[in-house]
């Protein structure tokens, strides 16, 4: 046998595979499987709770309560949400206004220009130059600035995007990553806030406001996290006192008695203890940042809570077992949760109003004196038996300021009133840590002690406890028993099945959700993804077409529909729909990525490259777009830059088999064979059923003298794709290298009989040269 000649043949075949590596448009095949719908759901609005008929412009309150309104406007709640204004900015946008986030490789700069405020993001590109530059205008500010100010940008589709850098008041003010963003895979400029966020940071939006070019009711828009063009600015009087229209009308009527005027508004001071506490707890009781920490009743829309109504009719609070394990964890929304642990609270009738006047919050030394006096109203006779440090007060030891565990750049007062403070530095810097979903196990009902005896409450408990033992079965039983009209609980089951990878059940429960409300966009998206995952492409496409018919400007549905058309080879339709998606939202990364795929398929490489780069400008850590750009550059022979983008794809998604595969092919062409073997081995590990990866790895192993390992990989190819002629040829050559001619003959003869003419010719040549 002429071993050198066989080796030469093997080497040439390896280069042939690398040089002709075709672009694999990963997004077109995998996107539906990777999209995750939100785990938090919006409610449907029952007819009797139309907010616009009950609420008034908060300015109406000022007419009679001018002094109270003036002091309230200075409180944190009164300044909780506002339009951004360069004139009123407390931050320094000129000095120390950059954040280099090493974990994600992003650089952010805060800019003031022409009376407007912006956050600018950039990265260092392949050549060391600035790339992926995106600038978003700051349209709204969340937070009073007492502790922090976070920023929102209104996207073209009406969503409010939380920006990644926040200003923190500690240490005279500085910039750092927003809560939840100090992570490698942070959300950058594409995290749309949910209505639940707005619930506690602002007044209720007016349901008469049309949020989507006048075409949608508020509640259908909130399903998609789209907010009205006009929003309240700050938590107003009606969040604590209830809807004010009846009160204003009574006060404006000269015939109204004082009793009638008082009866038309809620005065929290006159409520019983629990109802009074609940007015504050609607926003200041969070048991844990781990989810689920609360569950709203399916028959209550997000903005339907009214002061004085039992909170349990609106939502229930839960405590994850994982949170119980860390009993002294302190979070930013923990005030009521920590207060309820205190002996002072448990052994008295104290409420939040015992210490706080929500209309007038003191600061500095005045605040200290005020709160110490509140303590002394019950503890004036206490005599300390130990020497106290100079200048210490009740608050110093019993309610110290602490750094919050979930928002690590904020220091707040711990409302857990206890005899001695923890023996550690409560202000020490903390690193942000975010728990994974798998870290959350069972949850138990925290508040109230017993839920209301209603189907809505029973279902809410079951929905929150889906991950408890037999939780899914319990929820499904209740849904079958009560048949609620709202779609959210059904979608909750569908999304839990998605976590398990049970796509047929995902489709079943998504359909049930849509039976309850046919325009429920999260269920449309969920159903479509499940149908594509189960190879029901035609039905999945129809589902998306029906969704687009209902929401013609929905860039998510349009992008998914374009993807569906591309999968089925309908490139003209795909391109048209994706252009609509880009028009609706120019910053949807996947739309640009898919348009790049279409341009690449048409041979328009310059357009393809432009779209792939635009996709990455919108979302730099998009693994698919990085991989697609890497493939395009690979084909053009721009190897070093191609390697840069393949590495970016793998960094974004280390389990992305095709990126490892493509990078391995490139490395083989670049003659970096050990690295190529490592990448292809990783690709095989992540995608063991892909015969092409096994074949490429086998070719590479054989070319580098690892015939035994190569034979194993060729054997795996033939298990996955029997009689595959190229694998038969490769295995035959490998067996010749191992001096196993009889076994080699079998595979070379099979290759010679295959339908691929070039493979057959080479197999016949080897048979003639070595075995005949």
Predicted features and spans:
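Structural signature of tandem alpha-helical TPR/SEL1-like repeats
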Residues: 468-476, 499-512, 533-546, 567-580, ...
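Helix-start (N-cap) detector for alpha-helical repeat units in TPR-like alpha-solenoids
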Residues: 486-488, 521-522, 555-556, 589-590, ...
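N-terminal Sec-pathway targeting helices
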Residues: 7-21
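Structural marker of alpha-solenoid helical repeat scaffolds
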Residues: 481-482, 516, 550-551, 584, ...
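Primarily the internal scaffold of c-type cytochrome electron-transfer domains
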Residues: 39-45, 52, 59, 67-144, ...
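Terminal, low-structured helical/coil segments at or just beyond the last alpha-helical repeat
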Residues: 737, 745-772
């Amino acid at each position: 046998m002429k071993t050198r000649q066989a080796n030469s043949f093997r080497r040439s075949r390896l280069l042939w595979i690398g040089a002709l590596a075709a672009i694999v448009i990963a997004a077109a095949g995998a996107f539906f499987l990777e999209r995750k719908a939100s785990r938090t759901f919006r409610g449907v609005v029952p007819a009797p709770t139309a907010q616009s008929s009950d609420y008034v412009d908060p300015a109406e309150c000022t007419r009679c309560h001018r002094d109270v309104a003036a002091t309230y406007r200075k409180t944190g709640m009164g300044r909780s949400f506002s339009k951004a204004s360069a004139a009123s900015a407390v931050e320094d946008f000129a000095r120390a206004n950059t954040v280099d986030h090493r974990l994600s490789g992003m650089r952010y700069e805060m800019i003031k220009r022409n009376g407007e405020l912006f956050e600018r993001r950039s990265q260092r590109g392949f050549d060391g130059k600035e790339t992926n530059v995106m600038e978003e205008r700051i349209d709204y500010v969340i937070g009073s600035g007492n502790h922090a100010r976070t920023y929102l940008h209104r996207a073209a589709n009406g969503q409010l995007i939380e920006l990644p850098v926040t200003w923190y008041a500690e240490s005279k003010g500085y910039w750092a990553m927003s809560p939840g963003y100090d992570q490698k895979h942070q959300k950058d400029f594409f995290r749309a806030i949910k209505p639940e966020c707005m619930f506690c940071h602002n007044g209720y939006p007016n349901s008469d406001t049309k949020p989507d070019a006048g075409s949608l009711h508020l509640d259908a828009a909130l399903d998609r996290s789209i907010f009205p063009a006009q929003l309240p600015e700050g938590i107003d009087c009606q969040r604590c006192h209830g809807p004010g229209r009846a009160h204003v009308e009574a006060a404006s009527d000269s015939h109204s008695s004082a009793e009638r005027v008082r009866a038309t508004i809620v005065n929290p001071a006159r409520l019983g203890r629990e109802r009074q506490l609940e007015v504050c707890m609607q926003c200041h009781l969070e048991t844990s940042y781990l989810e689920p920490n609360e569950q709203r009743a399916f028959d209550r829309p997000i903005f339907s809570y009214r002061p004085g109504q039992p909170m349990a009719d609106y939502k229930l609070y839960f405590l994850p077992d994982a949170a119980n394990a860390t009993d002294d964890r302190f979070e930013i929304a923990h005030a009521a949760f920590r207060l309820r642990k205190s002996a002072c609270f448990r052994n008295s009738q104290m409420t939040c109003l015992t210490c706080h006047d929500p209309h007038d919050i003191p600061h500095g030394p005045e605040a200290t004196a005020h709160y110490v006096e509140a303590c002394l109203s019950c503890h004036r006779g206490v005599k300390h038996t130990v020497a106290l440090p100079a200048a210490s007060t009740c608050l110093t030891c019993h309610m110290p300021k602490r750094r919050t565990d979930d928002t690590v750049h904020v220091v707040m007062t711990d409302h857990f009133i206890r005899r001695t403070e923890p023996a550690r530095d409560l202000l020490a810097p903390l690193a942000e840590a975010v728990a994974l979903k798998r870290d959350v196990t069972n949850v138990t009902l925290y508040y109230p002690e017993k839920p209301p005896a209603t189907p809505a409450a029973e279902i809410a408990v079951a929905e929150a406890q889906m991950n408890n033992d037999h939780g899914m079965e319990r929820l499904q039983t209740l849904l079958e028993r009560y048949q609620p009209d709202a779609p959210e609980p059904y979608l909750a089951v569908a999304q839990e099945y998605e976590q398990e990878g049970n796509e047929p059940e995902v489709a079943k429960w998504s359909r049930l959700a849509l039976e309850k409300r046919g325009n429920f966009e999260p269920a449309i998206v969920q159903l479509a993804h499940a149908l594509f995952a189960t190879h029901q492409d035609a039905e999945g496409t129809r589902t998306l077409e029906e969704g687009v018919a209902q929401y013609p400007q929905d860039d998510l549905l349009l992008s998914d529909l374009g993807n569906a058309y591309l999968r089925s080879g309908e490139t003209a339709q795909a391109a048209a729909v994706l252009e609509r998606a880009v028009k609706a939202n120019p910053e949807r990364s996947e739309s640009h990525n898919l348009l790049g795929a279409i341009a690449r398929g048409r041979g328009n490489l310059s357009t393809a490259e432009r779209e792939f780069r635009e996709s990455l400008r919108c979302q730099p850590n998009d693994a698919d777009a990085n991989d697609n750009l890497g493939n395009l550059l690979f084909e053009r022979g721009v190897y070093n830059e191609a390697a840069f983008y393949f590495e970016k794809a793998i960094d974004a998604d280390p389990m992305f088999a095709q990126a490892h595969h493509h990078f391995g092919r490139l490395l083989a062409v670049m003659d970096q064979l050990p690295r190529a073997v490592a990448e292809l081995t990783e690709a095989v590990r992540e995608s063991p059923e892909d015969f092409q990866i096994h074949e490429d790895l086998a070719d590479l192993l054989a070319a580098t003298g690892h015939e035994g390992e190569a034979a194993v990989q060729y054997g795996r190819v033939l298990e996955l794709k029997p009689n595959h002629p190229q694998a038969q040829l490769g295995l035959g050559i490998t067996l010749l290298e191992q001096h196993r001619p009889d076994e080699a003959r079998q595979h070379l003869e099979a290759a010679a009989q295959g339908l691929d003419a070039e493979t057959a010719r080479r197999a016949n040549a080897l048979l003639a040269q070595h075995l005949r």
